């Protein structure tokens, strides 16, 4: 009898231990799962040939990804947020496949030049999530297309250029001819002509986004012909436009030479100390494209489980994703008032800005 009672008690203790152990295991597993879900999200971007220090499009995208990473306590690297830099167009597909193998939850292709590579890789890897910035990929559930109304923002800097020029000659330097840069050229030209119908507009292309020397060569030719305001939509090539304007300002501080930057606030790029010992800035304004806002926004949505695959998200004046930069010291109050007037007309639909020259 005692043996039977002891055996029964022992079996109950063992059973209790199993139940408690199971409960403890379930709790620990749940906690482990929660930790994984909150920390395991990873994201990467593949640059075009400009790289993350191009002081333009890629840099703005990287700033947005860094902001997202820091806001979510993530570290730079394969376990958090990262970038893969492309030295040439041949690197696009290679870098995208590297990102896929690293199992990033979201992979950005920065710039329309990556469209073909993303189309191919996303088709081969339907379970991975991609985003193409500045172009459109249709009918692909694992790709989000991010676009900007560049023509609207370019129209506004065209208004600034048309009202600021003293020579009635302005210039546009494009990187590579295509649908995206067409919008910059078309918007800028329309804005200039809206406020200064008699202005002459010199349009030239460098056929590259990463050749500052070519940009400087074009700028030198334009300034020599009497152009006093140049808007560049040329990525790193535009650094050469700034270099030429600063050289001219340094030699002759009284000369009015201006550059309108692109994609991000390029105020710092225009700083120069002239031969008279005084500090100047040749940046008239910049047509900002808040790539950082778009990159941060989509990463945040995707991390929360809201990846809008198969759709295109457009950012424009209504979201302050395009427009003039914050540094406006070199623009008169009258010109800024005109900019606001035309901005409202565009937002209200009273002005339809062209997308093609």
From Swiss-Prot:
Pfam families named among the record's database cross-references: Bmp
CDD domains documented for this protein: PBP1_PrnA-like
SUPFAM superfamilies: Periplasmic binding protein-like I
Chief localization: membrane
Covalently lipidated residues, kind S-diacylglycerol cysteine: 23
A single Gene Ontology CC term: plasma membrane
Top-rank lineage group of the source organism: Bacteria
Places the protein is found: Cell membrane
Lipid attachment points (N-palmitoyl cysteine): 23
Key words of the record: Cell membrane, Lipoprotein, Membrane, Palmitate, Signal
Family: Belongs to the BMP lipoprotein family.
The name this protein goes by in its record: CD4+ T-cell-stimulating antigen
Organism: Listeria innocua serovar 6a (strain ATCC BAA-680 / CLIP 11262)
Gene that this sequence comes from: tcsA
């Amino acid at each position: 009898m005692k043996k039977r009672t002891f055996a029964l008690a022992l079996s109950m203790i063992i059973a209790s231990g199993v139940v408690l152990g199971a409960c403890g295991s379930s709790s620990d597993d749940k906690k482990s799962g929660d930790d994984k879900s909150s920390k395991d999200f990873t994201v990467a971007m593949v640059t075009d040939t400009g790289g993350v220090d191009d002081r333009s499009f890629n840099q703005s995208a990287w700033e947005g990804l860094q902001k997202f990473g820091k806001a979510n306590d993530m570290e730079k690297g394969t376990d958090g947020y990262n970038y893969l830099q492309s030295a040439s167009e041949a690197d696009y597909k290679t870098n995208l496949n590297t990102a896929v193998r690293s199992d990033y939850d979201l992979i950005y292709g920065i710039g329309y030049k990556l469209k073909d590579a993303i189309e191919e890789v996303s088709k081969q890897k339907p379970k991975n999530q991609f985003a193409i910035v500045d172009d459109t990929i249709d009918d692909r559930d694992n790709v989000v297309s991010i676009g900007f109304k560049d023509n609207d923002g370019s129209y506004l800097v065209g208004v600034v250029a048309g009202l600021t020029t003293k020579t009635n000659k302005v210039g546009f330097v494009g990187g590579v001819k295509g649908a995206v840069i067409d919008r910059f050229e078309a918007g800028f030209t329309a804005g200039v002509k809206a406020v200064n119908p008699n202005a002459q507009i010199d349009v030239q292309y460098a056929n590259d986004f990463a050749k500052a020397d070519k940009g400087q060569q074009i700028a030198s030719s334009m300034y020599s012909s009497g152009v006093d305001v140049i808007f560049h939509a040329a990525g790193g090539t535009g650094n050469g436009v700034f270099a030429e304007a600063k050289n001219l300002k340094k030699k002759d501080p009284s000369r009015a030479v201006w550059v309108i930057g692109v994609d991000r606030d390029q105020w710092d790029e225009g700083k120069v100390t002239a031969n008279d010992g005084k500090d100047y800035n040749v940046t008239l304004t910049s047509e900002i494209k808040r790539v950082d806002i778009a990159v941060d926004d989509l990463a945040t949505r995707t991390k929360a489980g809201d990846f809008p695959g198969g759709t295109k998200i457009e950012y424009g004046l209504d979201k302050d994703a395009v427009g003039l930069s914050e540094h406006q010291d070199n623009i008169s109050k009258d010109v800024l008032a005109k900019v606001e007037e035309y901005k409202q007309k565009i937002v209200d639909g009273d002005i339809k800005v062209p997308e093609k020259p």
